[in-house]
Amino acid sequence: MKTGLWCTSAALAVSLSLLAASSASAEDSFYATAAAPYKGTTIRVLDEITPLQETLSKIVPEFEKETGIKVEWELLNHFEVINKGQADMLSGRGYYDAVMLHGFQVGPMLSAGAIKPVDDLVKNPKLDNPKLDTADFIPGPYKSLAFANGKQLGFVNWNYNQVYWARADLLNNPEEQAAFKAKYGYELAPAKTIEQMRDIAEFFTRKKGEKLAGKPLESDFYGIVLEGIKGGSTFGTLWRDFIKNYGGDIMDAEGHPTFDRPENVEALKMWAALWKFAPPGIAEYSLVDVPTVMGKGIAAQTLAWSDFVLGVDKPGGSPYAGQFVYGPIPVKAGATTPRSAEAEPSITVITAGSKHPEATFLFMQWLVDKKQQEKLIELGQGGVPVRETSWAMPAIKDSSNPTLYAAMKSTLDVGTAKPRMPKFYEVYDQLSGIAQEVGLGKLSPEEGAKKGQAEMLKLCDKCLL
């Protein structure tokens, strides 16, 4: 009797095991099944090259193996991916089936009709993965970027975000701590307010021969480094890390320019003050140069894109790897307005000229699928999450660099895509130039605010899509 009961139980266990395996296999084969009609198709996808995409490139071949769809995945630098991708999209020729767009590109591309919405593909049960779990996407970036005018454009692929980045070895040095407290009256620590960031910048700006952490400097040292080129993300930093944290903005809710408001003038004053403590070449620094300067140990602190940090703060990435600390973007002391932090969630969209939208849509889903996102984080020994569940992965939760991920999460908790502006590039070009002129002292903050308002009004009275 006991033997018979054991056999029955064993058979039941085997059946349940096979059923579970069959269920798991069915789930794993969704993309293979959905892709069957498109086997042998070749799609071309254009993306940006950062440490994140370099890691992802290792698993893209798995999609080809699973589906039989060939992916020609081209990676270009930040500026090239913008220029080449937009040129193809605006031409309508559809050389690329999908192009990665930064959030600020979406407005101009939408107004040009260069993006194919994915609503019809999402509604197709043969193509839409019912277990994609879009509710798991970090909501601010996803909801502000992937939808427009009642239509879905895609999913969030990259949650680029800025963090506060400083030299922990300097902030924790007892001599520097004592000297800082004697001068400013409070403890030296990672800046939580913009005013503290300014004090730290002033304090650590030293000339060659002066001592830093007890040792004579062989060259000048700077209290801060910021992006300063005309273009790149210079104005984005000023706008959403400074102006908005001062309670200002460049437009009102209806899109009417408000660049000359008093809060913006105050933010510009702080912006100009910080440039005095930066390296003399700041006006030529791009978003790529900022992490390079930090990695070489030339400056004490910065506001930088966290994905570039991943390539610097690691063994072999910098002589100072392991000696950095990170924090949320500092806010204005006593601010009562909502906290702001610069982020650039980015999306892979199907081009209006794509000849293979179905196969491309399957690849887009596969990229953001939880399984692939887990692999991406694991292979990269960290990364920048697009899903909430990624924060709990061991590579992040148990990271040797916990302050970096806490800082990332702080930004992504409030980070959103930029407002949809058809004339974003024209507006950005003007305001980026003004940001540089104010930083260099060629314009006073008041003059900069006045000029910015006038230039915006020349371009648009209502600047939103």
Which ranges hold each PLM region?
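Extracytoplasmic/periplasmic substrate-recognition and gating elements
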Residues: 150, 170, 265, 269, ...
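Glycine-centered hinge/linker elements that transmit conformational signals in sensory
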Residues: 196-205, 238-284, 329
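Short, solvent-exposed loop/beta-turn-alpha elements that line the ligand-binding surface or hinge
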Residues: 33-40, 120-136, 173, 178-183, ...
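Short, well-ordered beta-strand elements
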Residues: 39-50, 69-74, 97-98, 224
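Long, aromatic- and glycine/proline-rich binding clefts that accommodate carbohydrate-like moieties
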Residues: 31, 39, 322-331, 378-437, ...
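Hinge/lid segment of periplasmic solute-binding proteins
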Residues: 27-37, 103-163, 213-220, 235, ...
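Short, polar/charged alpha-helical segment
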Residues: 29-37, 49-71, 169, 431, ...
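Extracytoplasmic "Venus flytrap"/periplasmic binding protein-like
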Residues: 58-137, 154, 174-175, 293, ...
